[in-house]
């Protein structure tokens, strides 16, 4: 590969770690979750593949201290405020936030923080927990809203499950493969099938209970979130996902 890309990645990470002091705004938890996850993935890659030596100014112990500090001291407080608050958002927020909490736990080798994210996934009152975002039928908390947010919501749950899988925990299997059911439901809806069950959702906040029908906005506009679940359930585990497969082969 071209070492200049690695150098640029390190420049970006060091730049943020040395200057970022606060994340603020009305969507700050979502920003911290989504944008932070991209940063922490890059940091994880560089930390273990581009070490400092006599030839390149790669990852050093100083980088570990400063970049871990950024995630703990700038990102985590925003995420923690959301986690501890009374539920107030659609589930894609909670899923995005919790995914980043887990990622920080992994990156910083903080097992209690990682376990906190696992507990949120199973047990939180927030719309972003697994049982509150995906019903047994596969319907998603935001199915009555639009399809773009559904793809985001189920996608972040799959990414979280993949992070946990790398740590030896199988969250993909939780609640009888609930994530898989969500993907199959989402795929079937967006492929144009009409024989899909839909119920008015009673969400955790009480604010999003007025969607009477399937959300048609962004219908059939597929985002790149289907591959990760298909790879796990079909390629790793040998479980059929016929509608998700149709999405990927369309």
What residue ranges belong to the model's regions?
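CBM-like carbohydrate-recognition segments
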Residues: 171-250
């Amino acid at each position: 590969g071209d070492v200049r890309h690695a150098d640029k990645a390190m420049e970006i990470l060091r730049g943020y770690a040395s200057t970022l002091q606060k994340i603020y705004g009305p969507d700050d938890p979502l920003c911290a979750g989504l944008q932070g996850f991209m940063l922490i993935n890059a940091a994880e890659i560089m930390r273990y593949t581009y070490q400092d030596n006599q030839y390149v100014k790669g990852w050093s112990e100083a980088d570990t201290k400063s970049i871990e500090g950024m995630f703990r001291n700038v990102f985590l407080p925003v995420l923690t405020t959301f986690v501890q608050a009374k539920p107030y958002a659609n589930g894609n927020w909670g899923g995005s936030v919790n995914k980043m909490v887990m990622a920080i736990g992994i990156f910083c080798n903080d097992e209690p923080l990682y376990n906190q994210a696992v507990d949120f996934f199973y047990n939180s009152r927030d719309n972003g927990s697994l049982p509150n975002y995906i019903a047994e039928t596969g319907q998603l908390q935001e199915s009555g809203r639009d399809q773009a947010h559904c793809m985001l919501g189920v996608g972040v749950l799959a990414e979280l499950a993949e992070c946990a899988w790398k740590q030896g925990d199988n969250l993909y299997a939780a609640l009888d493969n609930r994530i898989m059911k969500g993907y199959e439901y989402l795929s079937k809806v967006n492929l144009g099938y009409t024989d899909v069950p839909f119920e008015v959702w009673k969400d955790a906040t009480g604010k999003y209970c007025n969607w009477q029908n399937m959300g048609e906005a962004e219908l059939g506009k597929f985002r790149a979130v289907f591959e990760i679940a298909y790879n796990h359930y079909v390629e790793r585990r040998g479980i059929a996902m016929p509608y998700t497969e149709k999405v990927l082969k369309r």
